[in-house]
């Protein structure tokens, strides 16, 4: 199935059902009083994280999603049926952003998490609610409120412990093939990797971590060159970044300049990502003598003023990969237990509440009482007053 990590949808919650005006009429009960029921609440729209789903492709073809409208109230004090909720299944790691405000509505990082993204309208009141000592035969009702409508941008961010970045053909995919069971495509031309991929690295029978590979970056990626930087978002949840540096680039470029290219693109994308723990991985040491290898590594470290961790490996021959994976596992285990950077769930507060909304309608009806009660039964005023939500 095609990998799609972004989609824009419209989530329409259901409108609330209207209240109704009705009076109890039975044999021998000529003046039974009001019995108009309330409407039903509108259905809500939810996002549900499912580990069995791994792409947002379905939302590319179906962008409009609506919950059911609440049923209108009925006579006999019958309340309308609540509208059915709309539940949208998304991959674990999906983030929902309001297109209009840029607000993060939900961030679903665990299987089974269910978050409301669009709130259904509240039910209207039947005329029974407006009965009072001075208005025994109310002909007022209130309409159900409109359901919330949101335009959402869904973004899928891979959940991995370690993320890899580097120029095309630096050896990232070869490294993942050598340390995990994943088999990303490997070839001798740029941008062999077109979509992100994951691999599980098993250090021993009981310990493992997940590593993510994204398409290579080139100079100007922040401005759209190559595949751009749209895939860098998949590294936001990673706890450690591996910066792969090719010691002997096929195009004859300078490893120092290549290293600065990646660092500059990271800085342009996000300070948060640029400040994550990052290790330098010098690849293809099997193609150089030990003396040349040390000379090139020293040159890069000096130019970057690097004081962090670095490793020399050959992804093809697996030289140095075992030590690297063990040290990665140890580092991951030493980091705080919260696996991912928690993004505070920000659900927009609905501007009105049931109790306040209904109380306002009843108060307004009392103030505008038209003296239409059973004492004036012979009066010919049977018009129904409809109260609209302000």
From Swiss-Prot:
Binding of GTP, residues: 166-173, 191-195, 213-216, 283-286, 314-316
GO biological process: ribosome biogenesis
UniProt-annotated stretches for the region Disordered: 22-42
Domain Obg: 1-159
Keyword Hydrolase attributed: yes
Enzyme Commission number: 3.6.5.-
Family annotation (Gene3D superfamilies): GTP1/OBG domain, P-loop containing nucleotide triphosphate hydrolases
Predominant subcellular localization, coarse grouping: cytoplasm
Organism domain of life: Bacteria
Gene Ontology MF terms: GTP binding; GTPase activity; magnesium ion binding
OBG-type G domain segment(s): 160-333
Pfam families for this protein: GTP1_OBG (PF01018), MMR_HSR1 (PF01926)
Swiss-Prot/TrEMBL cofactor(s): Mg(2+)
Cell compartment(s), UniProt: Cytoplasm
Stretches with biased composition (Gly residues): 33-42
Gene Ontology annotations for the cellular component aspect, listed alphabetically: cytoplasm
Alphabetic keyword roster: Cytoplasm, GTP-binding, Hydrolase, Magnesium, Metal-binding, Nucleotide-binding
NCBIfam families: Obg_CgtA, PRK12297.1, PRK12299.1
Subunit structure: Monomer.
Family under the similarity heading: Belongs to the TRAFAC class OBG-HflX-like GTPase superfamily. OBG GTPase family.
Protein known as: GTPase Obg
Gene name, Swiss-Prot/TrEMBL: obg
């Amino acid at each position: 199935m095609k990998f799609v990590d972004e989609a824009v949808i419209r989530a329409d919650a259901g409108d609330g059902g209207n209240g109704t005006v009705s009076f109890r009429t039975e044999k021998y009960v000529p003046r039974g009083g009001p019995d108009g029921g309330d409407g039903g609440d509108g259905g809500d729209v939810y996002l549900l994280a499912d580990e069995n789903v791994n792409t947002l492709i379905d939302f590319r073809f179906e962008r409009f999603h609506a919950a059911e409208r609440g049923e209108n109230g009925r006579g006999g004090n019958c309340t309308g049926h609540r509208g059915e909720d709309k539940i949208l299944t998304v991959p674990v790691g999906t983030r929902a952003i309001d297109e209009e405000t840029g607000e993060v509505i939900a961030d679903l990082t665990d299987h089974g998490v269910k978050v409301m993204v669009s709130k259904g309208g509240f039910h209207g009141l039947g005329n029974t609610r407006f009965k009072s000592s001075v208005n025994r035969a109310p002909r007022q009702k209130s309409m159900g409120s409109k359901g919330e409508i949101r335009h959402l941008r869904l973004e899928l961010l891979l959940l991995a412990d370690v993320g890899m970045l580097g120029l095309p053909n630096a050896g990232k995919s070869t490294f993942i093939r050598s340390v995990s069971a994943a088999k990303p495509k490997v070839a001798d031309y740029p941008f062999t990797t077109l979509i992100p991929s994951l691999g599980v690295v098993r250090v021993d029978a009981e310990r493992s971590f997940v590593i993510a590979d994204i398409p290579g970056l080139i100079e100007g990626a922040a401005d759209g060159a190559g595949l751009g930087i749209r895939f860098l978002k998949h590294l936001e949840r990673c706890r450690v970044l591996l910066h792969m540096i090719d010691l002997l680039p096929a195009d004859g470029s300078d490893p120092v300049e290549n290293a600065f290219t990646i660092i500059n693109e990271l800085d342009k994308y996000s300070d948060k990502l640029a400040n994550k723990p990052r290790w330098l991985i010098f690849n293809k040491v099997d193609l150089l003598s030990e003396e040349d290898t040390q000379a090139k590594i020293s040159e890069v470290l000096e130019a970057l003023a690097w004081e962090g961790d670095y490793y020399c490996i050959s992804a093809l021959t697996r030289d140095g990969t075992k030590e690297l994976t063990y040290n990665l596992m140890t580092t991951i285990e030493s980091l705080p237990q919260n696996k991912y950077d928690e993004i505070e769930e920000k659900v927009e507060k609905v501007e009105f509440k049931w109790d306040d909304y209904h109380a306002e309608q009843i108060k307004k009806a009392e103030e505008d009482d038209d003296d239409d009660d059973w004492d004036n039964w012979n009066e010919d005023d049977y018009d129904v007053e409809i109260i609209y939500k302000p």
